[in-house]
């Protein structure tokens, strides 16, 4: 069988790019062929946008490395630092394990049934939670922190 393309038909110039008819046919690449480089991905999916870290995030991460004397001395803080710390970021940082323990440390009441399997003691569970809430010194703080993120 004779080749039906001549050498001049096998290649064509399209938008300044060399295109081989046998491999590309001048059409868009089929999605199942996969993306082989980041530039191809960005050309194929421009809605992905650039991967750029925001300046605010950069400034927040550098503030974690502050020394204790910088934290204690309010006069040495710059105006931009004060403004940034007063802005609400929507994040809640728990600095103590006590704060996390008061939220996640609740113990569930369980009792063994006659056949030896465990089940919740539903009758005493609500009463026990009320007593724990009254004795929890961190409850008010936790509720106020969670309320500010909503």
UniProtKB/Swiss-Prot annotation:
Which superkingdom, per the lineage?
Eukaryota
Location in the cell: Cytoplasm; Nucleus
- What's a GO cellular component annotated to this UniProt protein? nucleus
Q: Where is the composition biased (Basic and acidic residues)?
A: 12-23
Q: Where is the composition biased (Polar residues)?
A: 1-11, 83-93
Keywords (alphabetical) are: Cytoplasm, Meiosis, Nucleus
The record's principal subcellular location, in a coarse class, is cytoplasm
Single GO biological process annotation from the record? meiotic cell cycle
Q: Where is this region: Disordered?
A: 1-150
Function in brief: Has a role in meiosis.
Any idea what this protein is called? Answer: Meiotically up-regulated gene 108 protein
List the top taxonomic levels of the source: Eukaryota, Fungi, Dikarya, Ascomycota, Taphrinomycotina
Gene coding for it: mug108
């Amino acid at each position: 069988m004779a080749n039906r393309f001549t050498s001049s038909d096998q290649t064509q110039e399209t938008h300044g790019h060399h295109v081989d008819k046998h491999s590309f046919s001048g059409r868009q690449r089929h999605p199942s062929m996969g993306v082989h480089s980041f530039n191809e991905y960005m050309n194929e999916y421009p809605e992905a946008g650039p991967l750029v870290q925001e300046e605010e995030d950069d400034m927040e991460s550098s503030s974690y490395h502050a020394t204790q004397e910088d934290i204690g001395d309010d006069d040495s803080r710059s105006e931009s630092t004060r403004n940034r710390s007063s802005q609400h970021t929507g994040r809640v940082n728990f600095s103590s394990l006590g704060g996390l323990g008061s939220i996640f440390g609740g113990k569930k009441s369980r009792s063994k049934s006659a056949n030896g399997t465990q089940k919740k003691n539903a009758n005493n569970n609500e009463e026990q939670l009320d007593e724990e809430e009254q004795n929890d010194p961190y409850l008010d703080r936790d509720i106020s922190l969670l309320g500010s993120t909503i």
